[in-house]
Swiss-Prot record:
Function field: ATPase which is responsible for recognizing, binding, unfolding and translocation of pupylated proteins into the bacterial 20S proteasome core particle. May be essential for opening the gate of the 20S proteasome via an interaction with its C-terminus, thereby allowing substrate entry and access to the site of proteolysis. Thus, the C-termini of the proteasomal ATPase may function like a 'key in a lock' to induce gate opening and therefore regulate proteolysis.
Record's keyword terms, sorted: ATP-binding, Chaperone, Coiled coil, Nucleotide-binding, Proteasome
Coiled coil: 23-95
GO biological process, one term: modification-dependent protein catabolic process
GO molecular function: ATP binding; ATP hydrolysis activity
Full protein name: Proteasome-associated ATPase
PANTHER family: AAA-FAMILY ATPASE, PROTEASOME-ASSOCIATED ATPASE
Protein's UniProt keywords contain ATP-binding: yes
InterPro entries linked: AAA+_ATPase, AAA_ATPase_domain, ATPase_AAA_core, ATPase_AAA_CS, NA-bd_OB-fold, P-loop_NTPase, Prot_ATP_ID_OB_2nd, Prot_ATP_ID_OB_N
Pathway listed: Protein degradation; proteasomal Pup-dependent pathway
Signal peptide stretch: none
Organism: Geodermatophilus obscurus (strain ATCC 25078 / DSM 43160 / JCM 3152 / CCUG 61914 / KCC A-0152 / KCTC 9177 / NBRC 13315 / NRRL B-3577 / G-20)
Amino acid sequence: MGPGLGNGPDEFRARRERDVTALLSQISYLEEEIGLLRRKVAESPRQLRLLEERLAEAEGRAAFLSERNDKLAGTLRDARDQLVTLKEEVDRLGQPPSGYGVFLTRHDDGTVDVFTGGRKLRVSVSPAVEVDVLQHGQEVMLNEAMNVVEACGFERAGDVVMLKELLEPVEGEAPRALVIGHTDEERVVHLAESLTDQPLRSGDSLLLETRSGYVYERIPKSEVEELVLEEVPDIDYGDIGGLSRQIEQIRDAVELPFLHADLFREYELRPPKGILLYGPPGCGKTLIAKAVANSLAKKVSAVKGEGQAKSYFLNIKGPELLNKYVGETERHIRLVFQRAREKAGEGTPVIVFFDEMDSIFRTRGSGVSSDVESTIVPQLLSEIDGVEGLENVIVIGASNREDMIDPAILRPGRLDVKIKIERPDAEAARDIFSKYLTTTLPLHPDDLAEHGNSREATVGGMIQRTVERMYTESEENRFLEVTYANGDKEVLYFKDFNSGAMLQNIVDRAKKMAIKERLETGAGGLRVGHLMQACVDEFKENEDLPNTTNPDDWARISGKKGERIVYIRTLISGKGAESGRAIDTATNTGQYL
């Protein structure tokens, strides 16, 4: 116990001190750990925010990369499509050229005959092309092996030829025709099926493809269509004023032979072939010709019991008929009468009206710079004589220089009836005015009041005042003084140069004045004062129109016949007009000429 017990407590204390030291070390370590943990806990929110920011940045970058990837993918797709398109274009450009041909006929074994490159070939047809629907003359496409791979349309370009006659068809072949080219050579051609359903007549213009020998289309000849105006005029005899005697003459000449052909045959009377209407300009020659066609159509339809009146009025524009090429004018004349014969063959009355007849059918040998009338006149004569066998065609010519028309045309048997359309006198002027001044027009209240508000009396008074103003031989109406070859002199008044066209123009002027007055003042209606002023304006406007350079020619056109006029002097005062002139050379003519 002595020495052993003495060492025991020391050892215990030493051990306890070591334990305490170890515990203190652990406590110190734990305290450091606690401090570290506390610092980490304090710093964790900031790190969390930093991580969240990094995460958001990563997500944004991922979205940007995804969008960029989509754009790159689209660009790659476009590049691939473009490569495919370019490859197709290269393949297409590398294909051999396709040829064209004209289908001629088909065979039972499925092959067809085509015309291509100046050769006639028998070729096969692609299954994509229906052989049965191919038409004669149709254009087809050929591949490199000369097989038909596609059906096309019909040719639309070529030479223009004139049909002479249709030939007898040959079984299994396209119809044929005889045509005349521009150099008058004749050629036999085939008709394409595009023409087989159209009525063709001699003289038609056709489109020819010269290499294949097919005609494809009927071409309207514009120059002929413009010259010939087919129409049923709506002008009635009741629309014409002041020409009752001339209308009666022309009705006797035209309507009687058409309506009573049996009586003409019984009396062995040949109906007239033609009528010449001559007289000063603007007096109704063309108007009468149109009324003839209209009246004739109504009468014939009434006799036949047909409901609708039908006739043809072939209005030939004289100067436009002329053509600078030799033979063209004669061809136009032949076509005109051919058209007339075709229409007359249907049992329909046909009026062939030549306006300004003196411009194309002058006396042969009277031409100054050409002798074109030497062939045109005989052509017309032969056509008129050819009309003899037709029952429904009559020729009407109009001219204000009948002295210049070739006498062979005017002789009996051609233009049998000659009717002069004279200038209207006072009575005729009243009749003409009544066609344009009607009771349906707006009339001024003051003028109505002067005639007891009677519209008929007001219009009648207007017409009477206007006629008196125009036809009075007063000082203000003096127009010209003419000197004849025998030395006599005569004063001509405006009434000596009136025409139906001039009377209509006066009424139109008055109506225009009434309209302007209505727009300016609000008070409307036609007044007699408007008509008086219109007369003055019409006279003044035409003061300088008479051609005093060649009085004799002027007199013929104006309708003044008899003693030869050698001198004309105008009597218009206040205009500073020159005195008259003797015969020199003709210049421009005006309305009066």
